[in-house]
Every structure is written in C-alpha cells, then in structure tokens.
C-alpha cells in the first residue's frame, strides 16, 4: 500500500526475532491482499469493479472495515466518504492516478 513498517521492542539479545517479523509481515500481507487499492487483485479492488447490485462474499476483516467506514460516513453526515476513490484518481492521486491536474467538469461528474 505504498508504505513501510517497523517495530520497536525490548527483548533479550538472544531473542530470535525472525518468527515475530514473519508473523507481523504475514498479517500485513493479509491486509494488503484484502484492502489495498494499489493491488488489482485485492478484495477491495475486485469489490470496486463490481457493478451496482452485485453480490460478493467478503472476508470477515474486510467486511468489518467496510461496515465501520459506512458507519463513520453516516455519523459524519458524509464528511467522510469511503466512495471517494474515483474522485481521488480524477485529481491525480491514488493507485490508478494519472497526471496531477485539475480535472475538467466531465471528469468530476464521472467520478
């Protein structure tokens, strides 16, 4: 998702950190596989390509995040909008973005 991670902890100098690193990386890989708009085959990318009214079984974690996003959108009266991806792309930001420029009226309407 275009970022890095690090963990700081205090352990004995003899502690083998490889299992911890592998466990953290495994969980992060799972999040990316489900929720990265930068990955064409992620669950969210496939979900976003569905036509309106289509059904898809979602992993429990993805469903939980999606449900929370919808609740925040409702609670904020739309100030937070989880469907803003096409608009972000139109302005030239995001995973599928083109050149950063002010989009024309049609591009904004399409988004």
Language model features: what each stretch is:
Residues 1-111:
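A contiguous, well-ordered beta/alpha segment that forms the leading edge of an enzyme domain
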